[in-house]
Structures are given as C-alpha cells and as structure tokens.
C-alpha cells in the first residue's frame, strides 16, 4: 500500500491527533473515554440516578443521545430556522427509567442543550472533545448494526439484500469525521454515493453553482474514502473512474453496485473498534480508574477487561430472553455484527446464535410500550478470550488481495477459513456487462473466480487468555470448516427506521 506512510491508526483518527507513538495514542484515547466517564457520572448526579439506575443501559443511551443532540450544530441551526410545533430547538431530552416501589417507571426529562454542552466540556477539560462524541456515535452505530436489518435501504439503492454484510456503519451521521469513515463498510459508502448521484440526476442544480462545488468536493472525498477501502488495483482503478466522471449518472451507479458486489469476495478493509456505552466508562471512573494515566486502546484487550468487571443492566420485555439480549449488546460492544459466528462464539465462550433465532427486540424502549410488565436483568458481557480487532477484510496469503470472507466482515484478527458459495455470488455477475471499461470488470471477476473457499485468512493469528495482556501466546482455534456462520441467516429482524 503506497499510502502506508500517511495512514493514521484509528486511535489517532478517533482523537483527531497527528502521528503519535503508541504510548501517546493510548493516553489520548484514555483521555477521551475518561471524559465520557466523567460526563456520565455528572449526568447521573444531575438526574439523581441511583447506582442501579445509572447502570441501566437504556438510561445510558438516553444520556448519550442528549449530548449528541446538544452538539449537533447543523440540526440545531435547522431547528431554529424551521420551528416545528412542540419542539424546542434549545432543549433536548428523552426517557429516563427509575425504580419505584419495585417497578420501573419512565420519566421524560428535558434539559437545555447549553447546559448539557457545559457539563460535557467541564468533564473534558473545557474542550469540545469531538472525539468522544464520535466514539458515542460509533457505539450507537454498532448497536444498530447488531439490532436491525437494512434490507429496505439496500433495495432502494438498487443493491441486493444479500449484501448486508457490507453495511457496517450505515446509520452513522455524516458528521462522524475520519473515525466514522474508517468504520463504514463498502456497502455503506456505495449507498451514500448512489444516493448522491441520484439526487444529481433528479435535480439539475445539484452539481451547479457555489453549493455544487461543495457537493463535488464531498463527492470526490467520499469516492476516495471508498477507494481506500479496496485492496485490489482493479477495484481502485474503477473508483478513480467513478470519481473523475464529469457528470455522474447511471453508468457510475452501475459501476458502484458492481464494486459493492465484488466486495463480497474481494473484501474491503473496514476498521472495527470496541466502543462501549457511556455508563461502562462512568463505572470505571467512579471506581477510581485513571484512563489517561493507564492508557486505553479500542482494538486490544482493554475493552474486554473493562467489560469483564462491569455490571450493566437492561430492561427486558415480558417475552424476551435475557441471554439473547446480552448477546446483542456483547456484539454491539465489540463491533461484531458482521463477524463469523464461529469466531464470536469461540471468543465469547458461549454459543452466539444468528439473528433469526434471537428472542429479543432492540435495546431501546418505545415511548408507547407498557412499563408495568418491564423487568430488568444483568447483561452478561464477559468473554472467555480476547482478540485483536482488525482493519483488514481478511485477505489471505500475506494481504495479497485475494478473497476475504463472504457475508461476514471479520472483526477479530483470528485465523479461519473462508467458506463461501462462489456459485451464488458469481450468479450476481452474469450478464452484467453493460457498464463501461470491461477490462477492469473482467480483471475483478477473474480474481473473484480464482478465490478458493478453503483459503485461510489471518494465518497464525489466534485469541488470547484474558491474563495474557501482552498477547504473547496466541491460541489458534480450529473451526468446523464446512460451516460458515453469518449472523444474518434466517433473518427476521426489524428494519432500521429513523
């Protein structure tokens, strides 16, 4: 990779820093999550939450959403210019759940955004701490990835629901910066670009004038982000072509969808980081842990350690299975919605089941749900082993871009084979030659055809005991090679709707 010299690690993106050494990165990431923890503690004090209520993941999510909303400048400006009935642009709030006489009750709270911003800045040494905000966005995005399916969104942009494993980060806001771009899947980027091109087709002024210039810059930037996710020269060359198009239209949409399909075998590199709910950082800070001094990494043992000794609760609906609710949150915490279930199960130490078999709905509770019947349970977020998170698509033989893993986007750097049904994927390409420049297409299809399902990815990489913090003794698991585990098989999850 030619750009290796300029690549920043994701901790640097996360903290907005320039190139730093490992210790500085650990310290600045530590400062970021410590700030989130301090903010959370302060909010619990403001809201007079008991210890138990403060550990409730639904309360954590409400508090996180309030601070994200308080700092959403674009939306705040929009709300002030377009006042809508019953929405105070200067206030933010949400449901807080309290324990009263052995029952859970919902209380809707409202706060001045200014006040929330003040508390957040105070917890972050007076700074805006955008990195911490992005971190919370990524946690929400990971939770959405584990909870909802995006079939409708895929179909609307002309993609195939089978491409769901490319959709990591599809609910991240546009303002999530470099750290957000790093965790977006190939399908997510393609979808954003296709939507943009469609707007340009329908609205003549989209690419024109002063605004059009800004639009064009955004378009090219998104193309470059997507290009950087591809690992083969032919895929990148096609991206150059899409980016340089004078007037992007249907030909570009065709090319992008072709590229998205190709990413099912020639995986893009997508970053994974373990972003935890604010209450987890709050608990650690409250117990006297100094994140900045100790240092912290989103891709190593630290999040596993933290979850190992945090007790987090969740509201449970009458017919939900608490173990399944725990699995959902565990996957969200480790950004493992698109990981092979064989790998996740091994690391977690308990069987991780596909989403179609989960008896649980999302974590958030709608305002019209009946609280009378709500119970709460401890979430089991501990793991048997830990593993390093990856930012590659799992290409085999020394990252020479051959096959990555289909219908999964590997999260953990752990050796596994890549079982995939080549026939199914190649079927998606038959007769689809009407785009342009068929030589790049031919090259991409040739690479896909030569990918072998028995290839091993992440060769020699293993998991580690939780006592092995320096990652000295990798344990390389052996998996049943015939059996691929995608989380999305037999899917019946709800759609994600804003």
From Swiss-Prot:
Record keywords, A-Z: Capsid protein, Helical capsid protein, Host nucleus, Host-virus interaction, Ribonucleoprotein, RNA-binding, Viral nucleoprotein, Viral penetration into host nucleus, Virion, Virus entry into host cell
GO terms of biological process kind: symbiont entry into host cell; viral penetration into host nucleus
Entry's Gene Ontology cellular component terms: helical viral capsid; host cell; host cell nucleus; ribonucleoprotein complex; viral nucleocapsid
Cited InterPro entries: Flu_NP
Bipartite nuclear localization signal (motif): residue ranges: 198-216
Its job: Encapsidates the negative strand viral RNA, protecting it from nucleases. The encapsidated genomic RNA is termed the ribonucleoprotein (RNP) and serves as template for transcription and replication. The RNP needs to be localized in the host nucleus to start an infectious cycle, but is too large to diffuse through the nuclear pore complex. NP comprises at least 2 nuclear localization signals that are responsible for the active RNP import into the nucleus through cellular importin alpha/beta pathway.
Family listed: Belongs to the influenza viruses nucleoprotein family.
Assembly notes: Homomultimerizes to form the nucleocapsid. May bind host exportin-1/XPO1. Binds to viral genomic RNA. Protein-RNA contacts are mediated by a combination of electrostatic interactions between positively charged residues and the phosphate backbone and planar interactions between aromatic side chains and bases.
The protein, known as: Nucleoprotein
The organism of origin for this protein: Influenza A virus (strain A/Fowl plague virus/Dobson/'Dutch'/1927 H7N7)
The gene coding this protein: NP
């Amino acid at each position: 990779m030619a750009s290796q010299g300029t690549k920043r690690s994701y901790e640097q993106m996360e903290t907005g820093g320039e190139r730093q050494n490992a210790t500085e990165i650990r310290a600045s990431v530590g400062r970021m999550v410590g700030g989130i923890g301090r903010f959370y503690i302060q909010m619990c004090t403001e809201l007079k939450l008991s210890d138990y209520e403060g550990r409730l993941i639904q309360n954590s999510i409400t508090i996180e959403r309030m601070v994200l909303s308080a700092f959403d400048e674009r939306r705040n400006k929009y709300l002030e210019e377009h006042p809508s009935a019953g929405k105070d642009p200067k206030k933010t709030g949400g449901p807080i759940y309290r324990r009263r006489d052995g029952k859970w009750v919902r209380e809707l709270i409202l706060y001045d955004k200014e006040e929330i911003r003040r508390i957040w800045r105070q917890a972050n040494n007076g700074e805006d701490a955008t990195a911490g905000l992005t971190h919370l966005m990524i946690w929400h995005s990971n939770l959405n990835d584990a909870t909802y399916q995006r079939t409708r969104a895929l179909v609307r942009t002309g993609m195939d629901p089978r491409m769901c494993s490319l959709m990591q980060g599809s609910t991240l806001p546009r303002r999530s910066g470099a750290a957000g771009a790093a965790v977006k899947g190939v399908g997510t980027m393609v979808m954003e670009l296709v939507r943009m091109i469609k707007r340009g087709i329908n609205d003549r002024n989209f690419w024109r004038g002063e605004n059009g210039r800004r639009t064009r810059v955004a378009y090219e930037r998104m193309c470059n982000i997507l290009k950087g996710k591809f690992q083969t020269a032919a895929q990148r060359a096609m991206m150059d072509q899409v980016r340089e198009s004078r007037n992007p239209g249907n030909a570009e949409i065709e090319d992008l969808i072709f590229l998205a399909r190709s990413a099912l075998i020639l995986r893009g590199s997508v970053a994974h980081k373990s972003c935890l709910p604010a209450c987890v950082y709050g608990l650690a800070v409250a117990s006297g842990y100094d994140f900045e001094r100790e240092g912290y990494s989103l891709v190593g043992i630290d999040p596993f350690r933290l979850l190992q000794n945090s007790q987090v609760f969740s509201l449970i609906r009458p017919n939900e299975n608490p173990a399944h609710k725990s699995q959902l949150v565990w996957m969200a915490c480790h950004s493992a919605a698109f990981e092979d279930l064989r790998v996740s199960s091994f690391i977690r130490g308990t069987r991780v089941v596909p989403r179609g078999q989960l008896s649980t709905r999302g974590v958030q509770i709608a305002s019209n749900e009946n609280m009378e019947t709500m119970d709460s349970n401890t979430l089991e977020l501990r793991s048997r082993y830990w593993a390093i998170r990856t930012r590659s698509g799992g290409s085999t033989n020394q990252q020479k871009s051959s096959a990555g893993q289909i219908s999964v986007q590997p999260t953990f750097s752990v050796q596994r084979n890549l079982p995939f049904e080549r026939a199914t994927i190649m079927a998606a390409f038959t007769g689809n030659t009407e785009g342009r420049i068929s030589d790049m297409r031919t090259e991409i299809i040739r690479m896909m055809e030569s990918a072998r399902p028995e290839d091993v990815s992440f060769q020699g990489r293993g998991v580690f005991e939780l006592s092995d913090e320096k990652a000295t003794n990798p344990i390389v698991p052996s998996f049943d090679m015939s059996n691929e585990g995608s989380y999305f098989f037999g899917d019946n999850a709800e759609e994600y709707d804003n």
